[in-house]
């Protein structure tokens, strides 16, 4: 289940290793991009792509917009369902994980 892998990656669980962590700040477009990739002991590879706007926030937002895309990659990708999940904020991601792992 994808939610289980996402949760373990976020928590830096001992059964997964970060194999890529690329951070890029584009001053012209005011966007921060981050791509991370994990490999789990069972051979599953998980990639997270994030985009965060660096424009000044109003402070009224409890959960600012942040594009988050999780994708299962590698040879064993078909064993995980769903293989792809997108969120528009950390709050939405947190709620989805909470509901999936309940």
Model-inferred region functions:
Residues 1-102:
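Cysteine-centric segments in proteins
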